[in-house]
């Protein structure tokens, strides 16, 4: 395999709106949500209102597909059965719960993007779903007050006359729902998303990207990442990441290989553009994307065969630092996805190992490019080009990209 370059018009991936994973210096965060002066002026165009939808109304909206919860949500469900059950119990008891925050999709009126409350909505769907082939029934567990309902599913409760009142109360329980209409741009939604989650467990904006830019490519990426043992190994997880950091990681590396020359220092916009472009051109580029994902997995196995448990760790003060570094993954995956590079280096693994250690020990610019100001164009360029030059010095047939030194 010689190249993953796509024959697509570059104009297709120029997008004005920038939106959007954990902030480790390489990922998207709130500081990257750049607003133009015009975008600032347009904030007042958004309409925000509150309404009290009943539980039954919300469930009907989910069943109709108007509230999209991700078809593959079961693989990325963050709450346990006990946590879901306690939420259902809170509704049964009429306890106050946090509001759901939705945005009316500007591109598909009548459809809603979930900005806050996804796990609560998933809990309702698990309990009330009318599609049990797709969604296993939630069996209530860990209830403290309504403990007579422990071990019961919604279907079982429906068959018990003594549950009739509780079911009716639950279905008619109002849930405060905040709705945003006419949002001026995607950066607005991203800012709302960030502020809703300030102070809570960090969330991945990849979830929002999946909702804003659904399509064949983003669906493929979700399923591929969820099924990838390699991504679980890289992120040290046993299950798919419920905040979709595995999806973002695969998207990031794919974007660098396909569209590196288009990178302008704005990671959110860069990844967003990739989704838009590949969704639009999915039928023509599907084979190349699938081939890349296959080769990415081989690249990881090759890297592990060289560095073992120290793969994607920087070397500092005589030892490997015990922390995954995305910048090193950028460097290595960019070249090791090429089968001819792997084939050439398979008998030179010790040379690669020692060359990387020497690079970390002697090249302060490379260390800066994987440690600080990592998303800038010079840092991105340097860590990829510099590692390519190291491999080239070993004789590997690498294609080092010619990048603007902006």
Segments (PLM) and residue ranges:
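Conserved beta-loop-beta/alpha segment of the NTase-like Rossmann-fold superfamily
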Residues: 63
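C-terminal subdomains that position terminal phosphate/3'-OH groups for nucleotidyl transfer/ligation
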Residues: 250, 254-406
């Amino acid at each position: 395999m010689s190249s993953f370059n796509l024959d697509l018009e570059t104009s297709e991936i120029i997008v004005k709106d920038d939106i959007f994973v954990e902030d480790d210096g390489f990922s998207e965060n709130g500081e990257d949500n750049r607003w133009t002066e015009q975008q600032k002026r347009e904030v007042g165009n958004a309409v925000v209102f509150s309404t009290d939808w009943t539980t039954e109304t919300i469930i009907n909206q989910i069943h109709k597909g108007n509230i999209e919860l991700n078809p593959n949500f079961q693989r990325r469900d963050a709450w346990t059965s006990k946590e879901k059950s306690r939420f259902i119990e809170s509704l049964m008891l009429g306890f106050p719960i946090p509001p759901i925050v939705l945005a009316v999709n500007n591109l598909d009126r009548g459809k809603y993007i979930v900005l806050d409350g996804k796990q609560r909505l998933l809990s309702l769907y698990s309990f009330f779903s009318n599609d049990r082939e797709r969604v296993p029934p939630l069996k209530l567990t860990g209830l403290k007050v309504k403990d007579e309902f422990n071990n019961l599913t919604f279907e079982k409760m429906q068959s018990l006359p003594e549950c009739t009142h509780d079911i009716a109360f639950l279905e008619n329980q109002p849930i405060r729902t905040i709705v945003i209409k006419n949002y001026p741009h995607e950066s607005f939604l991203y800012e709302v998303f960030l502020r809703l989650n300030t102070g809570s467990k960090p969330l991945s904006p990849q979830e929002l990207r999946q909702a804003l830019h659904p399509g064949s490519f983003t669906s493929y990426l979700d399923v591929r990442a969820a099924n990838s043992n390699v991504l679980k190994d890289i992120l040290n997880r046993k299950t798919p990441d419920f905040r979709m950091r595995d999806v973002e990681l695969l998207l990031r590396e794919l974007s660098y290989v396909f569209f590196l020359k288009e990178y302008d220092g704005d990671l959110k916009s860069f990844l967003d553009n990739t989704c838009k472009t590949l969704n639009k051109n999915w039928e023509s580029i599907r084979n190349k994307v699938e081939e890349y994902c296959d080769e990415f997995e081989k690249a990881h196995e090759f890297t592990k065969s060289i560095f073992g448990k120290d793969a994607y760790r920087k070397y500092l003060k005589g030892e490997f630092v015990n922390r995954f570094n995305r910048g090193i993954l950028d460097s290595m995956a960019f070249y090791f996805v090429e089968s001819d590079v792997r084939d050439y280096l398979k008998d030179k693994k010790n040379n690669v190992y020692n060359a990387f250690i020497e690079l970390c020990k002697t090249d302060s610019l490379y260390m800066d490019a994987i440690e600080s100001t990592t998303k800038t164009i010079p840092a991105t360029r340097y860590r990829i080009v510099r590692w390519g030059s190291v491999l080239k010095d070993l004789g590997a047939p690498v294609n080092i990209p010619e990048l603007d030194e902006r």
